[in-house]
């Protein structure tokens, strides 16, 4: 039986509920007037006959500045579903990155991949995932997994959540209409979405197909970096992060709830939509951000600064100044440094770098690194501009600024080794000739000429 639906799952048009502005604010939102209890969290009887449910993303005793939780007022508690059963034969998702059949020895080679092909069969967002690499352990709540997705079907009568970590979703092709328990996010390429650990959601594809990247953060929640001497403004500004208003549906039927726990998928029958949160308040909620709003910082004298100036979000580790995960972007920007090699320089790094490309061309690679593709440069693997880029950048007139336009690249940088999965090392998308882009770098050394 289907009753009045406030929010439809067909996603035939963009959402209308709108957004609240700010990063990790104490939000308060209700889809029915008076649905939020006044001056208390768990009244004896919640308004409209709703259930009060606390949704915790951190320990109860986490310091107040880091404590994340929300109170949800919903038609049924999240506990109302049938028992979960393991989805058999499901091994395309990895959550433990020690040596195993799924994670072979990690080569020190530079690695690069072409985009995943679009599926030949109807495939939704969840079934379109495949794990490319990662580190740490979902069970230990440390590290991350990096997935790619390619899908051509909206999720129908099916809902999903990950208990393993929060999901940083980077669309490359195709819009995503993401319905969550706490409201709706409409996300397009050049935007990102973050779905907190445990939030139930479904994804519709208004353009019929979609492809992109997911960084699943097992550890400390993503946060905005400190700005230090940059000052009180810059990089990703808090006001540009958008969190949905409450919106709900009261819908009954034969549905499937899919849970991801320790890298395995589990399914349960559920007889109602979990998108039944009529009101909520708190600071643990999904959000989106438009990367085109990033306030890019750069040198206006000489040298190319470290890529930490492009940091959007970070997951901190237990070592001050060393992040578990950095999400960095390389957006359109002006380059004005004089007598300077302007592209990213040659580099070896104690951290490990997984890169993707949303749009255009990355300024350190003239060809081969294409939108939807990926690269991995692990700890102490040498990398940098290819031969063509080096020759061009070594001879341009640096008395004049130039604009790097029509681009959007990004990087997931981690403190620990990023281990590619067996799928990533065996797939036909792996570019066996990637190393050749540096073989054309010529010897210019002449001890007789400075």
From Swiss-Prot:
Gene source species: Burkholderia mallei (strain ATCC 23344)
Pathway(s) the chain acts in: Amino-acid degradation; L-phenylalanine degradation; acetoacetate and fumarate from L-phenylalanine: step 4/6
Gene (UniProt): hmgA
Residues annotated to bind homogentisate: 362, 383
Subunit structure: Hexamer; dimer of trimers.
Species lineage: Bacteria, Pseudomonadati, Pseudomonadota, Betaproteobacteria, Burkholderiales
Family: Belongs to the homogentisate dioxygenase family.
Annotated protein name in UniProt: Homogentisate 1,2-dioxygenase
Active site: 304
MF terms (GO), sorted A to Z: homogentisate 1,2-dioxygenase activity; iron ion binding
NCBIfam families: hmgA (TIGR01015)
Binding annotation for Fe cation: 347, 353, 383
């Amino acid at each position: 039986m289907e009753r009045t639906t406030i929010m439809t799952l067909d996603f035939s048009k963009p959402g209308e509920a709108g957004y609240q502005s700010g990063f990790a604010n104490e939000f308060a939102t209700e889809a029915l007037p008076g649905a939020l209890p006044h001056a208390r969290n768990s009244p004896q009887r919640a308004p409209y006959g709703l259930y009060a449910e606390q949704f915790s993303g951190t320990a109860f005793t986490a310091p107040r500045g880091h404590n994340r939780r929300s109170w949800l007022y919903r038609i049924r508690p999240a506990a109302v579903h049938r028992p979960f059963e393991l989805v058999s034969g499901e091994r395309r998702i990895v959550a433990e990155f020690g040596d195993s059949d799924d994670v072979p020895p990690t080569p020190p080679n530079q690695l690069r991949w072409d985009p995943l092909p679009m599926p030949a069969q109807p495939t939704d967002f969840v079934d379109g995932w495949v794990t490319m690499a990662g580190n740490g352990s979902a069970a230990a709540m440390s590290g991350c997994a990096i997935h790619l997705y390619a899908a051509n079907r909206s999720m129908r009568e099916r809902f999903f959540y990950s208990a393993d970590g929060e999901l940083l979703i980077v669309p490359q092709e195709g819009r995503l209409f993401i319905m969550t328990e706490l409201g709706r996010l409409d996300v397009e390429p050049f935007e990102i979405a973050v779905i907190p650990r445990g939030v139930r959601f479904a994804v519709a594809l208004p353009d019929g197909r979609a492809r992109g990247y997911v960084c699943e953060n097992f550890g400390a929640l993503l946060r905005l970096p400190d700005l230090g001497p940059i000052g009180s403004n810059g990089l990703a500004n808090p006001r540009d992060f958008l969190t949905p208003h409450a919106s709900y549906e009261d819908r009954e039927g034969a549905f499937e709830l899919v849970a991801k726990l320790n890298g395995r998928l589990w399914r349960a029958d559920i007889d109602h939509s979990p998108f039944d949160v009529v009101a909520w308040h708190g600071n643990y909620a999904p959000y989106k951000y438009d990367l085109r709003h990033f306030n890019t910082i750069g040198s206006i004298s000489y040298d190319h600064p470290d890529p930490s100036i492009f940091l959007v979000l970070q997951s901190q580790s237990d070592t001050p100044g060393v992040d578990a995960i950095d999400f960095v972007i390389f957006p359109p920007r002006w380059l004005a440094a004089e007598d300077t090699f302007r592209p990213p320089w040659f580099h070896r790094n104690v951290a490990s770098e997984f890169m993707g490309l949303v749009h255009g061309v990355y300024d350190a690679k003239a060809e081969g690194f294409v939108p939807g593709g990926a690269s991995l440069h692990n700890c102490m693997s040498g990398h940098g501009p290819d031969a063509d880029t080096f020759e061009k950048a070594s001879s341009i007139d640096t008395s004049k600024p130039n604009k790097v336009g029509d681009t959007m690249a990004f990087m997931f940088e981690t403190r620990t080794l990023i281990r590619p999965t067996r799928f990533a090392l065996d797939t036909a998308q792996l570019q066996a000739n990637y190393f050749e882009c540096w073989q054309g770098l010529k010897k210019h050394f002449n001890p007789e000429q400075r």
